[in-house]
Curated annotation (Swiss-Prot):
Main location per the UniProt record: membrane
Gene: pstB
Family designation: Belongs to the ABC transporter superfamily. Phosphate importer (TC 3.A.1.7) family.
Protein's name in the database: Phosphate import ATP-binding protein PstB
Domain ABC transporter: 39-280
Native organism taxonomy: Bacteria, Pseudomonadati, Pseudomonadota, Gammaproteobacteria, Chromatiales
Recorded superkingdom: Bacteria
Cited PROSITE patterns: ABC_TRANSPORTER_1, ABC_TRANSPORTER_2, PSTB
Keyword Transport: yes
Residues that bind ATP: G71, P72, S73, G74, C75, G76, K77, S78
Cell location: Cell inner membrane
Catalytic activity: phosphate(out) + ATP + H2O = ADP + 2 phosphate(in) + H(+)
Length: 285
């Protein structure tokens, strides 16, 4: 049993893979909050050329929760995440079969407005990618693309979005300075502010803290707890401590297959599959 192995491997609350205390101390979701399905994935298969990368993935991602995707490098985590807003469409020789539905709508239907889909499903990448513009213009960028020109509206949305991203107090007196002058952690929170400014339903975070120092990582994690009150969040992480700390649900992937998907506490303490147990206890990966 995993619990037995944890006792053997524990050193100051740590296992090879993650901190078991994180499960005890993690803020819990508010009771009574809806847990209906936001994203439904059915028999999803994906090829890059002749290379089959995703192999019949089936899952339902609950609304208003944080779902973490873990697994060794190359297992298909990020590829799956990019399917949720069709970023893989930009890759040559990519072919997809199966279905992904948001609120019952198949996002791979040919009638889907892809720019609108990417507004509804925002994405933040591993490396912060602010535009070489002012802090203000970074946040206002998506609104301007939508045709918003009213300065009062822009001001309100910029302030609200920066507050949501826990960045307002740090930048409110320098909004017209170049965003590239911010620290790495501030840049990543700015990118999150830019994403939430257009009022998405889902936020996809692909290793959002892997390039940041521990303090900046903590701020990103605290921000995720706050944002899940308004958005459904899916995060890819190689850091199992982070998955245990921040997520409500965890999906373990291996070689393009979804091996196990369960609430985080259960998956990390009593996994149903031996592959999952081996991975979270450091036997491979």
């Amino acid at each position: 049993m995993v619990s037995t192995m944890m006792n053997e491997q524990q050193q100051g609350g740590m296992t090879h893979g993650y901190n078991v205390e994180a499960l005890k101390n993690k803020p819990k979701s508010k009771p009574g909050k809806a847990t209906d399905t936001c994203l439904e994935v059915s028999d999803l298969q994906l090829w890059y050329g002749q290379d089959k990368v995703l192999k019949g993935v089936d899952m339902e991602i609950p609304r208003g929760r944080i779902t973490a995707f873990i697994g060794p490098s190359g297992c298909g985590k990020s590829t799956l995440l990019r399917c949720f807003n069709r970023m893989n469409d930009l890759i040559d020789n990519c072919r997809i079969e199966g279905h992904i539905r948001i609120d019952g709508e198949d996002i791979y239907d040919r009638r889907v407005d892809i720019p609108e889909l990417r507004r509804r499903v925002g994405m933040v990448f591993q490396k912060p990618n602010p535009f070489p513009k002012s802090i203000y213009e970074n946040v206002a960028y998506g609104l301007r693309l939508q045709g918003v020109r009213n300065r009062r509206v822009l001001d309100e949305v910029v302030e609200r979005s920066l507050k949501r991203a826990a960045l307002w107090d740090e930048v409110k007196d320098r909004l017209h300075e170049n965003a590239l002058g911010l620290s790495g952690g501030q840049q990543q929170r700015l990118v999150i502010a830019r994403a939430v400014a257009v009022e998405p339903e889902v936020l996809l975070l692909d290793e959002p803290a892997s390039a940041l120092d521990p303090l900046a990582t903590l701020k990103i994690e605290e921000l995720m707890f706050e944002l899940k009150e308004e958005y459904t969040i899916a995060i890819v992480t190689h850091n199992m401590q982070q998955a245990a700390r921040v997520s409500d649900y965890t999906a373990f992937m291996y070689l393009g297959e979804l091996v196990e998907f369960n609430d985080t506490d259960t998956l990390f303490t009593t996994p149903a599959k031996k592959q999952t147990e081996d991975y979270i206890t450091g036997r491979y990966g």
